[in-house]
Amino acid sequence: MAKSFTGRKRIRKSFGRIPEVTRMPNLIEVQRSSYDHFLQMDVPPEKRANVGLQEVFRSVFPIKDFSERAVLDFVRYELEQPKYDVEECQQRGMTFAAPLKVTLRLTVFDVDEDTGLRSIRDIKEQDVYMGDMPLMTANGTFIINGTERVIVSQMHRSPGVFFDHDKGKTHSSGKYLFAARVIPYRGSWLDFEFDAKDIVYVRIDRRRKLPATTLLYALDGADSAELRAERRALGKDLLPYEAQGMAKEEILGYFYETITYQRAADGWKTGFDAERMKGQKLLTDLVDARTGEVLASRDTKLTPRLIRKLQDQGLQEIKVAIEDIIGRYLAIDIIDEKTGEVIYEAGDELSATALERLEKMGVEELPVLNVDHLNIGAYIRNTMAADRNASREDALIDIYRVMRPGEPPTLESAEALFAGLFFDQERYDLSAVGRVKMNARLGFETDDQMRVLRKEDILKILKILVELKDGRGEIDDIDHLGNRRVRSVGELMENQYRVGLLRMERAIRERMSSVEIDTVMPHDLINAKPAAAAVREFFGSSQLSQFMDQTNPLSEITHKRRLSALGPGGLTRERAGFEVRDVHPTHYGRICPIETPEGPNIGLINSLATYARVNQYGFIESPYRKVIDGRVTDEVVYLSAMEEGRYTVAEANAPLDAGNRFADPLVSCRKGGEYLLVRPDMIDLIDVSPKQLVSVAAALIPFLENDDANRALMGSNMQRQAVPLIKADSPLVGTGMEATVARDSGVTIVTRRAGIVDQVDATRIVIRATEDTDPAAPGVDIYNLLKFQRSNQNTCINQKPLVKVGDRVQKGDIIADGPSTDLGELALGRNVLVAFMPWNGYNFEDSILISERIVRDDVFTSIHIEEFEVMARDTKLGQEEITRDIPNVGEEALKNLDEAGIVYIGAEVRPGDILVGKVTPKGESPMTPEEKLLRAIFGEKASDVRDTSLRLPPGVAGTVVEVRVFSRRGVDKDERALAIERAEIEKLAKDRDDEKAILERSFYTRLKELLLGQTSVSGPKGMKGGETITDETLAGLTRGQWRHISVENDQVMEIIEQTGKVFDDSVQRLQERFENKVEKLQRGDELPPGVMKMVKVFVAVKRKLQPGDKMAGRHGNKGVISRITPIEDMPYLEDGRNVDIVLNPLGVPSRMNVGQILETHLGWAAAGIGRQIGEMLDRMRAATVEAADKARTAEDLKERLRSIYGEAVYESDIAPMSEAQLMELAGNLRRGIPFATPVFDGAREDDICRMLEAAGLDRSGQSTLIDGRTGEPFDRRVTVGYIYMLKLHHLVDDKIHARSIGPYSLVTQQPLGGKAQFGGQRFGEMEVWALEAYGAAYTLQEMLTVKSDDVSGRTKVYEAIVRGDDNFEAGIPESFNVLVKELRSLGLNVELNQRTY
């Protein structure tokens, strides 16, 4: 595979044996595709599919007024260009959104009062502004009020029907009570459940239960259904009293088969049904009805063989004993033919008396239900018997009473309510997913546009429920991923917008009825506030709209790929049981079994697996390669969990031979959640890659297969907390995923088109495009780099160019590194030399001992950017002012401020320093006689403002890197704001000029190519017609004059004109873009109400590694730095190299994360080979080396690389390199050869040994270490090697905090708590007990009074300390006064009598 620009600079040797058949999908595709699907921004309005925003508008509109004289229709919607781009929104605290314009059509009708006919009187169409719709950035995030947010996808239960039982927990007998639940996407839930007496009940929306037959009676009977269909075809409907519900006969006929008994001369007989009687034990003798012969005696079991024998004998009818008929249930109503009276109803039990009466009446045929109470229970019949209702009217009214208790029911209102519950598309929506799931479970093939319930669905659900009770069929597993689906951004937004539009709809309908409809326009009817508020509420405060974790690129990607079971319509932490949180077999390849938070959210928040994608129905799919006749093909199919259950799937690392056939006679496979060994010809699919079952973070852990799962979980979670360091360093031992993560995270800069680098500096890269592109597109790409920007977590975002002027780049190459990336690879930490050994107790309990070299060389130093802002408001007493003129502040404190009172960029600031000077007017206070005297003498007005400057808080010290000044429109900008504006305009002008210069250069080059050799017709002054144009001709003219030359060739003239037009258009577009940006800059800013000016100051803080900082490896091996030891005291190797870090070997065996040891060995080998390459490189670069030796060394180097990388990689990537490229590659490898050991397909033990030998190191991976303090070797050899360590975001500087005095709580007057509030330590109940136990009464009194909430005592102690006196007197704590007031509020007068004894 051809390497990219950065890939050639450092080639990673992979130990993977399984080839990549399919590319990993873009890691943030989940977010992007979902929102694109919702907005359909790039689709012309007339071609938009009925999904997302289009579907929401279509479902709410048309809106009719109450008298149906006017209709408001939706025509189309359009999203205009956003007002500000992403960067402007972040700086100004705005939302990155586009105005949504909706075209609506208002149709007004005339209604003929006599005939009721309607005719159109007027149609008005108009565009209406419906608020702003937030847009997604290229990286899958949203900018809301200036901060970057992510909408997390939600896992919820799929709509559809689910069958379950209570696992015997409800009833004391332990009997299973079965239940079915229909969950729609929107609308009322429908539950069917058995009780302990085996009666089936129904609940609507978890209300009071009703017998299930009540619901069946309320449904249309067969005759009514036909009649309703006929009426609907005519545009009418059945009236409530015309419709008939399901009759008992129809209900019983659906659920049970019928057996017909016929009268015989001496009793009753029935047909011999072989299928029904198979396997039964005879309770009476089996007698042939024709011959009277006993064919089988009682207690005989009817085996298939015996039944076949009876059929062969021609048995057709058998006698039925009277006791067999008694206790059976009638299948139809029995009617007295003389009177027409119903004597027995369908479902009635036949008693001996009833049978006699029927015989007397001369009944010849008796249809009964096939219920044997063994295989078929009489549950529906018993429910019918228990049901008080027997007609449609009773059933509807009963349902109405349950749903609307306390309201008087009428038949019309009851029918309207029932129809609206499950059969009205406005109120009930199964969704396409729900219908697909229901079809699959019930065995229907209904179209997925049928979004409401049907009679057939309800009957089939009941039938399956009854069959489950009878022991047939399986219940559903609700944790199966076929029953859980993902709601991504687009769908969540769609639901939210629908809520907003429905609120709007009510208001529109009322307004249509109240205004003069003939004169209004659509915009007069619409108030878009509810819809805009719904959007704002969703993005601003929904549980699923989260502040993006931007600590490093991996944390961004992981956040966008997160799946949460919490949130609106989801689970809650407290109620989620163990099963929901557990790993399920269907998670394989879809949800990572490793990456989930520790703590209360474990298992509820998950991460999408690397290759997984979400399909159109919201189910997670995983890719598989097809296996045909035992041969693995390269055809890849994506399957959801439901579909996968039908296939036999082999694992990706099953051994294959050269012909891609399975090498073993039996292969380990999985099918339907079970693991089995099967023959190769029975296999249907094979996994695409071994890493498809883990998430991105887990796939970055080398030797994951050698780590315990709990530690792997900690490792994947802690990688997300790694702070970007000043010098990024990609891991020596990686997994091959690093480049993918860096590219997809969006922190690096990826080229949009192929081209040649024209200009490079620290802030931008200019590339001249060489690709043949659309003529309208400019021929130059300018990439602006982010310099020292603050991330959401206060880490530093800084991009560095990787290219030089003249470099050729291809489309998709990485041309600039971002935070935590190194040559286009993710680099979260540093490779450090580690020794596993105890060292004087400094690595007790996972503590980490580090060398001073690490601090000296800034190995783990990071930059953090803190943002401080101050606002100047318009107060009642006057305007606050940002100024350098601050009362009672010396010149020394103002040394860092400019004339506008704002700190300079580059100033070093310490805690307490003024960043922005601000004064606030204070109210006039009465003057003292002295002030009056001073004013009388000097006439000066005493200072009437107080100092409210922005000062640097304690614990922060650093350098000011950026200042932004925002002024309200109409307010004059100060000098600093104008200076910032000028600098910004200059930068924009430089971009414009550079782009224009490149465009001109390419245009005139092209023009010259076209003109040379042509015959001129006319031209500028001094040029004759008819001469051939040469270089000299053109050199004598200015470039601007070339455009005025006309040539004979018409085709060439046409191309010249066309090229000139494209060039002019490009230049004009450039100028327009520049003017637009300048206009935005010069326009005032939109600030919150009452704010006149706002200043933001960004301070960069350099954080060196120090004791108390938390560090970790990638295997969950975390610890806190205990000590920084001088370099000379650290253990060192025999060649004099000191180790950087000493870890405790006891941290490995009990944690079972052996991966870190393997990583150490392989890292040791990588560094050893790197040193060998470095030595060769030094020999090649040495000035004294002769050309022949240099060439020989170069050949040796190539051979060395061939032996390490293998023939295939060498031939494709290294052999074609020029000498300069080879030298650059070798230079990048001297630190160590980067290895990739993909998860579950990584380096084996023999690979590591081979690499150690290649590096000339001991196969054991252990070395002799010498004690730096004594110079004596340690007793045993020590495991030494390179491990990739991360510095985590838990820095001691952010946590350490001290206070003497500070803010106090208003009511209790006790100090506040926490660093953020500058609070104090709480002396709590247990601490009081400790002092009581020691009898330290005075210490205790001091703690509870003057050091806490004795207000007057506090002041007196302060005054005493100032005087140098150390005596104090304790008073009454304020909390005692609070208690007294509390008691008084209860009406108890408590008085405190103070006596001195």
Curated annotation (Swiss-Prot):
Record key words, sorted: DNA-directed RNA polymerase, Nucleotidyltransferase, Transcription, Transferase
Catalytic activity entry: RNA(n) + a ribonucleoside 5'-triphosphate = RNA(n+1) + diphosphate
A GO term, aspect molecular function: DNA-directed RNA polymerase activity
InterPro entries named in the record: DNA-dir_RNA_pol_bsu_ext_1_sf, DNA-dir_RNA_pol_bsu_external_1, DNA-dir_RNA_pol_su2, DNA-dir_RNAP_su2_dom, DNA-dir_RNAP_su2_hyb_sf, RNA_pol_bsu_bac, RNA_pol_bsu_CS, RNA_pol_bsu_protrusion
Family membership noted in the UniProt record: Belongs to the RNA polymerase beta chain family.
Subunit structure: The RNAP catalytic core consists of 2 alpha, 1 beta, 1 beta' and 1 omega subunit. When a sigma factor is associated with the core the holoenzyme is formed, which can initiate transcription.
HAMAP family with a match to the protein in the record: RNApol_bact_RpoB
Protein name: DNA-directed RNA polymerase subunit beta
Organism, as annotated: Rhodospirillum centenum (strain ATCC 51521 / SW)
Gene name per UniProt: rpoB
